[in-house]
Amino acid sequence: MQNIGRSILSYLKRADKLLWLIMLTISIYSLLLLRTVPKDDGKSYFLIHLLAIGAGYAGTLFITFFDYRNLAKLWWLVGGFCLLLLVYTQINGLAIESSGGMNTRAWIEIPGGLTFQPSELVKIAFMLTFGKHLSILQEKDLLKNPLQIVLLGVHALIPVGWMVIIQKDMGSAVVFFFMFLVMSFGAGIQLRYFAVIFALMAVAIPYAWNSGIIANYQKDRLTTFLHPEEDPIGNGLQQLQGRISIGSGQLWGRGLGDAPRVQKGAVPVQESDYIFSVAGESLGFVGCILILLLLLLLMYHVLRIAHKSTDLLGSSICLGFFAIICIQTISNIGMCLLFLPVMGVTLPFFSAGGSSSACLYLGFGLVECVAMHRNDPEHVTLHSRVSPAF
C-alpha cells in the first residue's frame, strides 16, 4: 500500500494539475447537460458519454506513463494502423447520417452494439505523426527545404483527401487542414509556403465545387445557412430550431431538466452536434458563456504547455490538440448561431459522440504527457526548442 501511495503522490507531483482540473470541470458540465437529454429508443446518451469519458481517462493515465518522445518513435506503426482502419471502414463500415448530411461508410461496429468513427482516432494520430515529421525535419535542418515542405503537404493531404473524396466528410477535412496550418506555423515554416497553399486552394475549391467532388447535398448544406428560412423543414431545420432553443433560454435558462424544447427533442441531434442549444435553453446565456470560457481556458493552457515544451515534437503535439479544440469549437458554435454552415463537427468534450469524446481524451493524454515528461533529463538540451512562433 505504501508503494501505491508513493506512486500516486509521485504522479500528482509531476502532473499538470490545472489541466486536470479544467478537464474534470468540463467532464462534469457535459454530463450534467446530457443527463437532461431524453433517451432515444432506450439509449442513454448520458451513459454512453460517461463510458466514453471513463475510457478516455483510462487511456490518458496509460499514455502519461510513457515519454511522448518514445511514443512518437512508433509513428510509422500508428500511421499504418490508421490507414488500414480507414480502408477497413470503407469496405466493411456502417453508413450513418449525421447533421453534416453524411451518409457514407465512416463508422464501424464494436462490441456492445456501439459504433466507432475511426476518423476521430486519426485526428489524434495526426498530432503524433505530423509532429514527429516536423521534429525529424528540424533535427536535419530541413524545415526550409522546398521538397521537404511539399512532402509535409503530402502528409497532410492523405487524411484531408480521404475525408473529402472518399468519405465526403467536409467537417473532418477542415479540422485536419487547420491542424496542418497551425502545427506548420508553430514549427516556423516560412510564410511564403502558406501563400502558395492558399493560392492552390483558390484554384482547388472552385474545381471541387464544379466537378462533383463536393456532392450536391453537401453544397446544399454549405449554402443553406445563408437563408435557412427558405428550407425550414429540410436542410434549414436544425439551425432554425437550434437558434430558437438558444434564444428561448434568455439569461439564466429554463433550468436543467425543465427545458421543454430539449424534452420534446425539437432540435435534431441535440445530444451531439447541437448540445450547445441544450445549454442555451437549459442554462441560458450564462450556460453558453461558461462553455466558451472553459474551452478558451483549456486552449490557453495548452498553448502555455506548448510554449514551455523543451522540443519541437512536444510543442507540435500541443498545437495539434489546440487546433482540434479551436476549429471544432468555432465550427460547432458558429453552426448553432447561424454564422457557419452545418458540417457535422462536434463540440469538443461536450457532444455525446462516444468516438469523438474518447479520442479527444487521448489527445488530452498526449498533452499531459508532454507536460509531465518535457523536463526528463535524458532528453532536455539547451537548444532543443526551436519554435519561432513562440
Give the role of each language-model region.
Residues D169-V174, R254-A259, Q270-S272, I289, ...:
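Transmembrane helix boundary and interhelical junction motifs in multipass membrane proteins
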Residues I4-M23:
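N-terminal membrane topogenic signal
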Residues Q250-V286, S309, L313:
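Long extracytoplasmic/lumenal interhelical loops at the membrane interface
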Residues G236-G257:
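Extracytosolic (periplasmic/ER-lumenal) interhelical loops and adjacent juxtamembrane/interface segments
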Residues M1, S7, L34, S331-F390:
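A juxtamembrane structural motif centered on a specific transmembrane helix
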Residues G112-L114, G265, P348:
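Helix-turn-helix-type domain boundary/helix-start signal
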Residues W20-I28, L32-T36, D40-Q238, S277-L337, ...:
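Hydrophobic alpha-helical transmembrane segments of multi-pass inner membrane proteins, especially
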